Amino acid sequence: MLGKGVVGGGGGTKGPKPSFVSYVRPEEIHTNEKEVTEKEVTLHLLPGEQLLCEASTVLKYVQEDSCQHGVYGRLVCTDFKIAFLGDDESALDNDETQFKNKVIGENDITLHCVDQIYGVFDEKKKTLFGQLKKYPGKLIIHCKDFRVFQFCLGYTKEEEVKRIVSGIIHHTQAPKLLKRLFLFSYATAAQNNTVTDPKNHTVMFDTLKDWCWELERTKGNMKYKAVSVNEGYKVCERLPAYFVVPTPLPEENVQRFQGHGIPIWCWSCHNGSALLKMSALPKEQDDGILQIQKSFLDGIYKTIHRSPYEIVKTEDVSSNFLSLQEIQTAYSKFKQLFLTDNSTEFWDTDIKWFSLLESSSWLDIIRRCLKKAIEITECMEAQNMNVLLLEENASDLCCLISSLVQLMMDPHCRTRIGFQSLIQKEWVMGGHCFLDRCNHLRQNDKEEVPVFLLFLDCVWQLVHQHPPAFEFTETYLTVLSDSLYIPIFSTFFFNSPHQKDANMGREGQDAQSKPLNLLTVWDWSVQFEPKAQTLLKNPLYVEKPKLDKGQRKGMRFKHQRQLSLPLTQSKSSPKRGFFREETDHLIKNLLGKRISKLINSSDELQDNFREFYDSWHSKSTDYHGLLLPHIEGPEIKVWAQRYLRWIPEAQILGGGQVATMSKLLEMMEEVQSLQEKIDERHHSQQVPQAEAPCLLRNSARLSSLFPFALLQRHSSKPVLPTSGWKALGDEDDLAKREDEFVDLGDV
């Protein structure tokens, strides 16, 4: 499997020494160097990509059974990627189509995808950083997409070892300037031959027209308006040039505190309720300024809270929910479960897998995010309340929660175009700091927090539990997570729309120079061929049938709320237990004196949530209506395709969901074939039908983690450690003792 091998040392686990060391002498390698070089794969460079350093006579370890095997070749480092060029080691040198990325090869690592670099010195594994006095004999690279690469440098010339190791460390770990990113080199070199997919209708939300269209789509244009007060970013560099605010709000209010303290519209529900977000005002000590802020917020609150017609519930996600530090700490522990260097290390951790998983708290954080989104959905759907999300800059957890709420409530967001437009609206235009949160510049490790990856994991839970409700697949989500680290797309490499426009040459540009044309990640034709793109689309998804005008007229008298939910009695505004006026709740939150736990009755909120949650799950699911996930402990699962795809021992050959999907596609093809014959008889012509990917037609040749892990050329024979079973202390259990020595090679 790609990137797997056994390292002698590291983590206290010693694997067997390489079998080929006893049979291949360094002299023989150098003698045959010319012959081997002829077989090497050619280095393909993207426009603007430059070779920085390289080393020959490098062995890349490939795990095969319980032994070690190596592939001979060159290790190179460019200003875009680290690449290994050796003999063709494809597991399937055949006619079968593979799910290949046109930008990144299976032995390529973009510089931004490198997580940690280790060196092995005398059987000891050490983290590499800065200037080295001594260079390792083995190089181990852990990637952010969970690949693990191991290279033996024992036969490489000393000068080449120094050059390649120092180059890789410097270009992956040293702080960078934004303008030094490969993104700009590529855009400059490929400016004339950049192509875009004409079928990509993703709404980018970079024009006033896009926001007006979204208001009209959600029927929010009766109460909200799109404004251009920040055009040219003259009010606030953090906000997009265009956004939506409540209609009664004067535009001069937006300018008063540079966009802080302003309710910005996210989405409107069919019953008239809306989801809003707001960034907190700067904390002040001066009583005079505090009074001005209080008066300002009082006017803002009266704009959005008009009892009894419109009631606003505030959710402070920065103080009463999750902290960014919690997310980062949990993910750091969680990812270590999947970055194993060899089979022995994998099986050693297998016996304590669940305890390690639980101690990371990552799945619990996912559950808490989904629960919070359901709570907000209940307020909007069942109680017809507006919800205002509060956060310091409204660009992290606000993005996450508002996106999840829209996924649950709006079926349009569950289409591929709708989902991409949602990310553009809430994350890209919402000012999520991708550059800092992904630490692309390596300038501040403390700012690195995988908020967007947490969002994708939450979305995967929904996709996994309700597959027919989504037009896209888990494979789509996986390649989207990988695209975070490919610096030819501008989508995930800026902190704000202003930063992007300023560095593209759109602000203060020369008359002769024209702005750079940066690619968007939503143009999937850049990464995948059309046949591979079929794996991004869910064949089980069925679009909602469109009603004709006659049917629409007949349904106008019906209430717009989902009929599958129980009708609840109208409820008064939330209890006020500390302040006389609800407006003080908002003011206290935004002025930094947050005590919202004392305001709302937790018992009432819990009862409302449980009633709403249980009632929805007791009914049959309308995949084109409201969609709620199960959030009980066992229902929140590990996203196996993303986290386990490079671990051979974690795969089920010919099994898993891919086997089920294969059978379903066979049935669909049969139905389509019959439909074609019927259409031929009626219309005397053949109607073209979508064809299932050929790779799915024989599930016995596929892995459960398809399409990233196909049937391996060599069988895998895991050696189960006896130390783990002895730790159980039950030596009389014959079954357990026998299982230690079961040979799985012939199964």
Curated annotation (Swiss-Prot):
One of its GO terms (biological process) is phosphatidylinositol dephosphorylation. It is found in: Cytoplasm; Sarcoplasmic reticulum; Cytoplasm, Myofibril, Sarcomere. Pfam families: 3-PAP, Myotub-related. Its main location: cytoplasm. It comes from the Eukaryota. Residues 1-14 have a biased composition (Gly residues). Residues 1-21 are annotated as: Disordered. Transmembrane segments: none annotated. The modification Phosphoserine is found at S564, S601, S716. Disulfide bonds: none annotated. One of its GO terms (cellular component) is membrane. Residues 205-643 form the Myotubularin phosphatase domain. Residues 449-558 are annotated as: Interaction with MTM1. Keywords: Cytoplasm, Phosphoprotein, Sarcoplasmic reticulum. PROSITE patterns: PPASE_MYOTUBULARIN. CDD domains: PTP-MTMR12. Gene3D superfamilies: Pleckstrin-homology domain (PH domain)/Phosphotyrosine-binding domain (PTB). SUPFAM superfamilies: (Phosphotyrosine protein) phosphatases II, PH domain-like. Belongs to the protein-tyrosine phosphatase family. Non-receptor class myotubularin subfamily. Heterodimer with lipid phosphatase MTM1. Heterodimer with lipid phosphatase MTMR2. Acts as an adapter for the myotubularin-related phosphatases. Regulates phosphatase MTM1 protein stability and possibly its intracellular location. By stabilizing MTM1 protein levels, required for skeletal muscle maintenance but not for myogenesis. This is Myotubularin-related protein 12. It comes from Pongo abelii (Sumatran orangutan). The lineage of its organism: Eukaryota, Metazoa, Chordata, Craniata, Vertebrata. The gene is MTMR12.
